[in-house]
Amino acid sequence: MPHQQILMLFGLLPVATNISTWWNFGSMLLACLTLQLLTGFFLAVHYTANINLAFSSIIHITRDVPYGWMMQNLHAIGASMFFICIYIHIARGLYYGSYLNKETWLSGTTLLIMLMATAFFGYVLPWGQMSFWAATVITNLLTAIPYLGSTMTTWLWGGFAINDPTLTRFFALHFILPFGIISLSSLHILLLHEEGSSNPLGTNSDIDKIPFHPYQTYKDMLMLTIMTIMLLTIVSFFPDIFNDPDNFSKANPLVTPQHIKPEWYFLFAYGILRSIPNKLGGALALTMSIMILLTMPFTHTSKLRSMMFRPLMQLTFWTFTATFLVISWTATKPVEPPFTTISQVAALMYFLFFISNPIMGWLENKIMKL
């Protein structure tokens, strides 16, 4: 039977014996994507993409639709879970040198960009006060592009300001992009299995492999169970933990919130954007904060793949992790000293991690006489 052959192939998939829990986040991302698609579909059925009705339709979903509150909370908190998993997944890739599998890394970075775009469009849909102003600030960055900026912004907005056409096209984009994410995820997994996963030691795993089932399937199920428990606990007891209080008010173009900030998972990029006092410079830094990941496979000079045996690079990596958290924290603060100085130093250190990668590799080769 064909399905038995598929199961057999899945069961016989060879996996390195020593891959740790950090390798489980890929399957967790797949679970998050499935959850977002299902809950998103049921929300789209009841949502109305109109500036006069969008906010009311969200209230209608949470109050009147059976289990609508659960769908809405699962979708919103599921997005946060998605980003927690993807940031850990990327950190694992950076630490253990998974980026040397070039095609997988480049498709993964493209997936991250698509995911961030989808999440941004989704944040605008409730048409709350913070949704509206976050959309205004971010789409306005297009005007920084020389010559084409103003035309592109007007084209994106569908008018001379953010209005009904903007919301309609953002809903359309939020609906269509996940299908692109599914396609690219399939390609990402396909490219990964061309070469197979790396392992914590960064060595060739061919000499010591085990079948995927039952070992990795049970390991995946354990992590998925832990994630599900966390998700349901937050949905049941702290549903508004990630929400902005301003977003409980309907969008008002005449009143600017005291402090405009995006969802927590965009804070690091927003912090880098704000740290540069020039509009075009900030927009470029924002773009580069993600695009710089693409440089990693091409700047790896060390003879060792994993950071497990690279103490200098370990120090650099954990400094980078702390920097990521510091930028996210400063992005929640007002634009005034000392926060501006801290965010500028942190943004510089963020980019220094990627710039120092080839230097550190060369230095470690020299020290270890490799």
Swiss-Prot record:
Binds 2 heme b groups non-covalently. Heme 1 (or BL or b562) is low-potential and absorbs at about 562 nm, and heme 2 (or BH or b566) is high-potential and absorbs at about 566 nm. GO terms for cellular component: mitochondrial inner membrane; respiratory chain complex III. The keyword Signal does not apply. GO terms for molecular function: metal ion binding; ubiquinol-cytochrome-c reductase activity. The chain crosses the membrane at residues 25-45, 69-90, 105-125, 170-190, 218-238, 280-300, 312-332, 339-358. It comes from the Eukaryota. This is Cytochrome b. Heme b b562 binds at H75, H174. It is found in: Mitochondrion inner membrane. A ubiquinone binds at H193. The keyword Acetylation does not apply. It comes from Chilabothrus striatus (Haitian boa constrictor). It is a multi-pass membrane protein. Its cofactor is heme b. InterPro entries: Cyt_b/b6_C (IPR005798), Cyt_b/b6_C_sf (IPR036150), Cyt_b/b6_N (IPR005797), Cytb/b6-like_sf (IPR027387), Cytochrome_b (IPR030689), Cytochrome_b_C_euk/bac (IPR048260), Cytochrome_b_N_euk/bac (IPR048259), Di-haem_cyt_TM (IPR016174). Heme b b566 binds at H89, H188. GO terms for biological process: mitochondrial electron transport, ubiquinol to cytochrome c. The cytochrome bc1 complex contains 3 respiratory subunits (MT-CYB, CYC1 and UQCRFS1), 2 core proteins (UQCRC1 and UQCRC2) and probably 6 low-molecular weight proteins. Its main location: mitochondrion. Belongs to the cytochrome b family. Keywords: Electron transport, Heme, Iron, Membrane, Metal-binding, Mitochondrion, Mitochondrion inner membrane, Respiratory chain, Transmembrane, Transmembrane helix, Transport, Ubiquinone. Component of the ubiquinol-cytochrome c reductase complex (complex III or cytochrome b-c1 complex) that is part of the mitochondrial respiratory chain. The b-c1 complex mediates electron transfer from ubiquinol to cytochrome c. Contributes to the generation of a proton gradient across the mitochondrial membrane that is then used for ATP synthesis.
